[in-house]
Amino acid sequence: MKLSSACAIALLAAQAAGASIKHRINGFTLTEHSDPAKRELLQKYVTWDDKSLFINGERIMIFSGEFHPFRLPVKELQLDIFQKVKALGFNCVSFYVDWALVEGEPGEYRADGIFDLEPFFDAASEAGIYLLARPGPYINAESSGGGFPGWLQRVNGTLRSSDKAYLDATDNYVSHVAATIAKYQITNGGPIILYQPENEYTSGCCGVEFPDPVYMQYVEDQARNAGVVIPLINNDASASGNNAPGTGKGAVDIYGHDSYPLGFDCANPTVWPSGDLPTNFRTLHLEQSPTTPYAIVEFQGGSYDPWGGPGFAACSELLNNEFERVSYKNDFSFQIAIMNLYMIFGGTNWGNLGYPNGYTSYDYGSAVTESRNITREKYSELKLLGNFAKVSPGYLTASPGNLTTSGYADTTDLTVTPLLGNSTGSFFVVRHSDYSSEESTSYKLRLPTSASSVTIPQLGGTLTLNGRDSKIHVTDYNVSGTNIIYSTAEVFTWKKFADGKVLVLYGGAGEHHELAISTKSNVTVIEGSESGISSKQTSSSVVVGWDVSTTRRIIQVGDLKILLLDRNSAYNYWVPQLATDGTSPGFSTPEKVASSIIVKAGYLVRTAYLKGSGLYLTADFNATTSVEVIGVPSTAKNLFINGDKTSHTVDKNGIWSATVDYNAPDISLPSLKDLDWKYVDTLPEIQSSYDDSLWPAADLKQTKNTLRSLTTPTSLYSSDYGFHTGYLLYRGHFTATGNESTFAIDTQGGSAFGSSVWLNGTYLGSWTGLYANSDYNATYNLPQLQAGKTYVITVVINNMGLEENWTVGEDLMKTPRGILNFLLAGRPSSAISWKLTGNLGGEDYEDKVRGPLNEGGLYAERQGFHQPEPPSQDWKSSSPLEGLSEAGIGFYSASFDLDLPKGWDVPLFLNIGNSTTPSPYRVQVYVNGYQYAKYISNIGPQTSFPVPEGILNYRGTNWLAVTLWALDSAGGKLESLELSYTTPVLTALGEVESVDQPKYKKRKGAY
């Protein structure tokens, strides 16, 4: 929307005077920014108008995917993800930082080793990926506490508010993390271009001022004071206009919001709920933030899945390639200019970092699987759209119109949204009016072009939109000076090379397509059959029609070669930027994009670069692959693939061809059931000889938790004593009168938690857990007690993670873990004195390498036996497949060697056999000291656990530790425990170094 010069001058004058001006244009109320300091940019590298960002003065669409470094703590594999994102045609990654992992101890910021952000930033630069930094302090993210460290449960103030106690608690973290981010801003040569100071600050309740401008301004000032000068962006959880530019104190520079239109019902993956496709986002944008580019900072790229859910394979089916085609192109109809998909790669909730509603996997059904595989069709579909956006700058300057069921298509079954360009090309987004329709619809189009308004197809036949599909038809599309009057086939990419231009078009199987080109040249089929191709020459253009074929055809029109592909064939094409100075592709500037070549190469092409007379490709292969390169510079004479000189041929069209042979290596994995397993009882607390004198006493008569008042004589909330993660153990001492008959206890551990209770060594019972239960009140019968005798009640609870804190004012993150209430029949509550423990040291946690959340409070964990080389030489020989014959908790340790071949990316999985026995049990598996699996036999769903290289030593010794908690008097055992792998990938990824894996060392003060 363009304002008149007079209007613009008046607005600028008002801004200079510090006034806010509101006016109405075409029915929309516009609020212009009232804060001149906001408009005076702090840097010159990242600017914007109402259409898009500019980076270094060049207009750019930000196409981004979400990726959290803390969910993949191996730095070389972080580069792998960045390169796979770059290969999509994307230019950006958004990331969270999990405060709970770097300030587990109040006042001690530890961001080294696997928590160091700088290697992540360096990898982004190497891959040529910009970054959107989202450090919180609140992140949500299906993480424990929403990223809040557990000690915030003791803060005497409302979280995410302007209460001083909360703001003071955030200062240390934000000052450190924002300073690191500032160091890597684009202004300092780094990859970070945007900063988000809060997260989904959208909902408030309970008498708290919301939205609170004082609070938002504070968190923005925290970033600015730490040196952040790049633009600030927000992500309103819905398009509500919170903190948009012009709203006063606390306003951000660029307004953004989130959208998850299909929801999270992975149990019904074929159901697209009626009316859930957004249609009003453009209207809302013009009302809320018309002077900034339209931004969706989180758009649905997958779904979470709860304990007992259908599994992430179902989520990837729900949010599949069809969803992408319909929903993402719908976003394009709103002229989205900053688009981030949540998630592009989910990763793993290792080491207790997840929230209570989710399990170990955070695969999210995203385009890149948890094991970093890219064989989901949705990855390939994204690549088509990402590369189209990369070469279609006219999209950003077009003017979006209203969707309509008339005027463009000849059927009301279809809806068309135009984006009309002024000499920069126009774009028409076509979908079914019922977005969930699975019908195939035949149609013709009437589109305005520079030549005339034309009905398409002109050469006969009809177009087809298949069910759950959408297309972007283009008119007056500029291919380096050649005008494509229209194309019904979709554009994958185009390039101008020294010897001519190349345009790559694709369509769905069985479709008919047509394009018209402004030219006086004839059409020549230079590759493939002429069958199914027709053309017609006019005085100023040529029209070409064709039926989509699985066999590639290439036509020549003047100096333009056009590749006609079917969609599945297009999936095999890549468009790497060609580096001429070094090996890094660089960021996606117009110059770098123009330098790209086109490669047909199957699984993955990472990079391309020139060195001397050599063209070097780095690529991955999962099958014998024919490689073709289009647009090879004339200076290149030799082809190198993954460093090896590769013989090639050159055809009449200048296409280089070579073959990469794939010979799968022999992969030999150890039989885990046959390892030399050692066993130690990890619940010695129920033995009569156990001494808990070193345990912390649960003797606080008041809690610092402001959410829930005490219902016990002393606090039994674990966070009051510094325990925020993993298993909790309580020991309650009392002297019997002989009249006690029952013991009732209300425990709380979060969704799907479990608990078990013993009286001395006598098992009383368990709560085995349900997804729907975050707490449970149980009553257990007691045996006849002897008057005057001392007894100990031992309670085991697993903390499934802390609640998130989405709605400001509810303070749900403070929901306590532990014992909420108890009743020993016939006795006052004060008759029992309690002790408790969690991880050794609590907030002063022992293992600074693996972080504050990785280990819980089981005896073996407190001792550090889960780390490599525990002192197991005198332990009993027993396997988790033998298990326990009664209720209790066992600990098992064993080692094995791997010798996997170099140069191969081999995804490995720990598989726990799905239980066929009725006895419920819970399992943790530690790999070289890192907890990488949590399994609940009676809830599920996860039974297969990816463990990345770097956590596993692929060429060396590895240590497994298993905790087995039997919650039934019959005991429990693993049905099976196996290592498996999926298709090895011949990879260009470099050597993967193992993360630091400290060995067992006797812990001072361990009890």
Swiss-Prot record:
Signal peptide: 1-18
GO cellular component: extracellular region
Active-site residues per Swiss-Prot or TrEMBL entry: E200 (proton donor), E298 (nucleophile)
Record-annotated disulphide pairs: C205-C206, C266-C315
A Gene Ontology molecular function term of the record: beta-galactosidase activity
Domain of life where this protein originates: Eukaryota
EC number in record: 3.2.1.23
Disordered: annotated span: 862-881
Keywords on record: Carbohydrate metabolism, Disulfide bond, Glycoprotein, Glycosidase, Hydrolase, Polysaccharide degradation, Secreted, Signal
Main localization category: secreted
GO biological process: polysaccharide catabolic process
Catalytic reaction annotation: Hydrolysis of terminal non-reducing beta-D-galactose residues in beta-D-galactosides
Binding site for substrate: Y96, N140, A141, E142, N199, Y260, Y364
Glycosylated residue positions: N156, N373, N402, N422, N478, N522, N622, N739, N760, N777, N805, N914
Name assigned to this protein: Probable beta-galactosidase A
Organism: Aspergillus phoenicis (Aspergillus saitoi)
